[in-house]
Amino acid sequence: MQGSPATNTDEHAAPGVRRPSRMHHHAFVTTDLEVTRHFYEDLIGLPLVATWAEVDRFPDRDRVYCHTFFELADGSALAFFQFQDPAAEPPVARQTSPSIHIALDCDEATQQDILDRLRGAGYSETDAVMRDHGYCKSLYVNDPNGLRLEFTVDVPDMPEILQQQKASAHQTLARWLAGDHTSNNSYRPEHH
């Protein structure tokens, strides 16, 4: 949720507490870096910007691996390890909940380009799913490792929506935890 850049002066940020500025990278394990590279670079459009062939001791044994980085527009990256010994680290679980995912911000044209490349590569409407959440429109797809990705386009008035959400976030959470599970998303198409 981009809306506006976070600062340490936000009313909900603890005074004087410095926050990280952005994600550097989010790393996962794969058993096939070439299939993973093809998906992220050729279909999604994230360039491979670094590949580290490594041998290191962590925590108590030598590990031989390759670590790749696929760059997003803000300079952050999605990263993938492949280990010489596949038993050294488990890959991404293929049976994870669809609620466990990485959401990437993009504009409509980029989202459509990604969808077009996926369709061109044979991804069906059930493999690459569009969903209108009201405050954003999302494209969901699993990568070849089973990792769920979301490509999100915020609505134009997202900064105002986020201001409203910031003002009520703690109250809504307390209400929900107390058992009142009434939806507060009046932006969904089914509410209009």
Question: How would you label these PLM feature ranges?
Answer:
Residues 77-80, 150-151:
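Short glycine-/small-residue motifs
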Residues 54, 83, 152-154:
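Residue-level structural signal for beta-strand termini and adjacent loop
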Residues 29-77:
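Core segments of cupin and vicinal oxygen chelate
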Residues 5-8, 14, 21, 33-34, ...:
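Vicinal oxygen chelate
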Residues 10-12, 55-58, 86-91:
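A short, acidic/glycine-rich surface segment
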Residues 69-71, 82, 140-142:
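Short, well-ordered beta-strand micro-motif
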Residues 24-25, 67, 78, 101, ...:
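Histidine-centered active-site/metal-ligand motif
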